Amino acid sequence: SRSSAASDVYKSHMIGIFGMFVILFKNIKLSLIGVVPNFIAAFFILGIIGLLGIPLDMMTITIAAITIGIAVDNSIHYIYRFKEEFNSSKDYNKTLILCHSTVGKAILNTSITIVFGFSILVLSKFIPTIYFGIFTGLAMLLAMVSVLTLLPSLILLIKPFNK
């Protein structure tokens, strides 16, 4: 069925992205931390679409893929910067403050630009395009919030870097 096929595709993407994180960061804990914010935004937005009874068509189903794709970039940038800065300071709290003032600002600015870019699609007269713009913009906003709040919180909680 279509639902089963879509589920298999998402499982494959999750495994692939997790594998990419493991190869990139060479750290299982850090990889698990890194994928959480990405999937939360995608699952949340698909949940809202389902609750509203909006059918999953080509426009709405690609929202999750786009969300994960962009959120993964944000997570990689944040984790990479955190790792680099932590190697110098060896202090999680100082590193968090530094990362939020540098890469955090960049993630915020690019994410807001992306949200506005997708939001312009609400001016369309084609309903699937309107849905795509609204929900992708909302998903990007949620992904940004997740990467800037949940990701650092998980890093502080789990402390995946060696002192």
Residue ranges of model-derived segments:
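Single conserved hydrophobic/aromatic residue that forms the stacking wall/gate
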Residues: S1-S12
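Interfacial segments of transmembrane alpha-helices in multi-pass membrane proteins
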Residues: K11-D57, L123-I127
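Loop-to-transmembrane-helix entry motif
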Residues: S7, F39, C99-T110, F135, ...
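Transmembrane alpha-helices and their membrane-interface boundaries in multi-pass membrane transporters
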Residues: Y78, Y131-K163
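Hydrophobic transmembrane alpha-helices
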Residues: F18-F21, F39, P55-I79, F116-S119, ...
